[in-house]
Amino acid sequence: MKIRKPVVGKMVVTAVIVIVAVAVYAVWGSRRSERVHVREMALAENPGLKGILELYQEDSLKYEAALFLIDNMAYYQGADSGELESMYKAYDIFSTGRYTYRQALDSAERLCGKPKNVQQIRWKADVDMEPGFLVSNIEWAFKVWREQPWGKNVSFEQFCEYILPYRIGNEELVPWREKLYYQFMPIIEKYKNDPQIENPTFAAHIVLDSLLRAPFHFTGEMATSVRIGPRIADWRGGSCLDLCDMLVYIYRALGIPCGIEELPMRGNNNAPHYWNFLVDQHGQTWYFSMFYWWHRLLKAEVYDDVYGKVFRQRFSLNRAMTDSLQLPLDSVHPVFRYPFFEDVTRLYATDKAFTLSVGKRHLVRHVKRGEVVYICMSDRYAWKPVGWTRYDGSNAVFKDCHGGTIYCLAVYDAAHDKLDPVSSPFSVGKENGKMEFYEAREETEDVVLLSKFGMLGEFFLGRMVNGVFEGSNSPSFKQKDTLLLIREIPGRLCTMVKTDSSKAYRYVRYYGPAGGYGNISEAGFYSSANDTVPLAGKVLGPEDGAAGDHSYFNVFDGHTDTSYDYPFADGGWAGLDLGERKHIGKIVYTPRNRDNFVRKGDLYELWVCREGKWRPFARQTATSDSLLFKGVPKHALLLLRDLSRGEAERLFEYKDGKQVYW
């Protein structure tokens, strides 16, 4: 029986696993029969795998370990050798720390050609691997498990899932255990006489601590459909998923059980997120990551984020989930068709992992009794499934859902490969689990919009709080008056404030607060509140803030997408010599920002969600830093698109005259 040629596609949870074999059954059958069937297919495709089972006939644990890998390898494939040269070169260049990822990508393309996309890459099924590769992997995995002092506190089940696997995703298959073992084992050897070394969390801590003491480079721009593989341990740079992969390779090479947790969709952003985890001998889950550089290992229950669902990636197929679905494979949404993950939301949310029940009265279309319904999270104007249940005829009940985010229910239309919403979207309170449905009403209102994305990640804005605008008649500002003290985080692109100073000043400036790095994008000083043209003068600032792309000259260049970033946390300022004394009647300032505020001249489109489906409402070109849309349905979720630039946008509600982002 020959296993089908790999089908190239991206699995949502592991982000890159592609299914190799699966002419298994038209309907998921029993757990044992599926496993045996896949095993027989793999052994028939690669007779050399039978030799591995014969080799370990007398070693029951190695025999079971070999079976564990064989029973799951038919679901995996990796990039063939030589297919990823350009991508590897981009990571290599980026790892130097001298270039942005975009610059590294451009350089790699000039040197190696354009990177191949996932459809262009040649794939190699794992069932076709050389038996010797698998034997070497098993031997090295057992070596570290049995030799490391903490190995006795790692169960065989944990060993199989989080030490033994020869790959993480769909990376090119290359040997890695021996190299990484000798490269990083010196970290462990320094603590070989420490009694705590028998605790796997202690071993994980000291390795992480050592790794965090050396430079590494993060970027949110790296998002490939192919995992980088063990080379990431040397390159030490990339996305949060790349950095997670790095720790998995290093930890498993040393015999430390380690895996990856995933937010399939962040509760307040349109992206997944990843971090590492370890389960100790007492069953306690600890989380950590190179991305979380400010701490080491922390207990799962203190994780603080808006996450909806947390999935634990695993090497083995979650057969308990496939058994419970009992559906034709093509009728299952791709996220859950081959689940190489398990839901561990409750480990993180504890008593804030709520059971949500959506009754028939909240459904917007007929759902058949027994039909599979998916609970989904927002991804711009689409929905991404993160859980499923069967509708019992009265309610759709979903367990272990974290709050602080928006959900919507949907069914999967297999014929058209799309989700059909069956409820209006609803929010869930983070602390109490209270549900509120957003159903567009006939009653309308006018809305004033200032941005298209929430303040998530806009830490620059807070750096203006306690900053001051000052006037002086001394070039050194030895004697100065405060014209304006910023007391709260700016909420729009251009904030205008009238000043009531009766004095005139030759020198004016913005002086950033302690820890603010002088961050500001634009500052304008006006003689009167009615003036529309700011005063001009010679730009001033500290000598060490004059160079680079973020110098103080940006503060007066008229562009809100450039900014000042002083090289030191304190002492940053930017000002003007007006040439003569002038009254200051108004100040307009723009915080350093990520360009998600409304910008004059850009074309925007407002979308409204009705019964779970997003529809365009109206378009408008901004004539200032705000937009006024009239006749918008009340109590509807909204989304603002900038058709002129950028991709960051997030759904929000309009409440008490303000945008409230979810």
Per-range role (PLM):
Residues 30-43, 56, 190-207, 211, ...:
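Hydrophobic/aromatic-rich core segments of domains that either
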Residues 35, 40, 58-235:
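Secondary-structure boundary elements
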Residues 335-347, 421-448, 659-662:
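Extracellular beta-sheet/turn segments enriched in Thr/Pro/Gly and aliphatic residues
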Residues 343-346, 355-369, 455-461, 593:
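Structural motif
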Residues 369-388, 469-480, 484-485, 594, ...:
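Short amphipathic beta-strand segments in non-cytosolic proteins
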Residues 380-395, 618-622:
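Short, acidic Ser/Thr/Gly-rich low-complexity loop/linker segments typical of extracellular
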Residues 394-408, 412-416, 502, 631-634:
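Short Pro-Gly-centered beta-turn/loop motif in secreted/extracellular proteins
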Residues 440-495, 499-504, 515-586, 590-600, ...:
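Disordered, acidic Ser/Thr/Pro-rich linker "stalks" and the adjacent N-terminal cap
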